[in-house]
Amino acid sequence: MKKALICIDYTNDFVASDGKLTCGEPGRMIEEAIVNLTKEFITNGDYVVLAVDSHDEGDQYHPETRLFPPHNIKGTEGKDLYGKLLPLYQKHEHEPNVYYMEKTRYSAFAGTDLELKLRERQIGELHLAGVCTDICVLHTAVDAYNKGFRIVVHKQAVASFNQEGHAWALSHFANSIGAQVAE
């Protein structure tokens, strides 16, 4: 079965210590795991999706405006990939198996062409990494489940600012949507 890695929201605003909506140290601690997974998938010729939250400054109609401070604003460094993932992406961005996509909702599937890209490549297994485990990773996983994809969540490559939410989401992945939670 063909597989893809979906790396979700691993950006400065979500991970850096001065990020606008940072998950803090837990997010920074998974950098090596995310970079290594990304390298592995690229080297093996598997599809790699970098799904990045993207917002317009001052968008009063977006539902997140009422929930969170402005973050991942188009044209800001906050929206850039975090740490060593950025130069890795820049090195491989023109390769056909590397896809950078913007998303405006929690799920990488909502309002995007992600499902089309995966189906065109006959991909049936999705490996998930990134932040936050209990928000965007969770919503992407549930949508993937509802679309019939096999799901693998890499426990060492997901994090959240909310440790209870993180633990709950890991349990939910395994027990409610049948995902493999890989150590």
From Swiss-Prot:
Top EC group: hydrolase
Signal peptide: none
Disulphide bonds in the chain: none
InterPro entries noted in UniProt: Isochorismatase-like_dom, Isochorismatase-like_hydrls, Isochorismatase-like_sf
Pfam families (alphabetical): Isochorismatase
EC number assigned by the record: 3.-.-.-
Family: Belongs to the isochorismatase family.
Record protein name field: Uncharacterized isochorismatase family protein PncA
Annotated gene: pncA
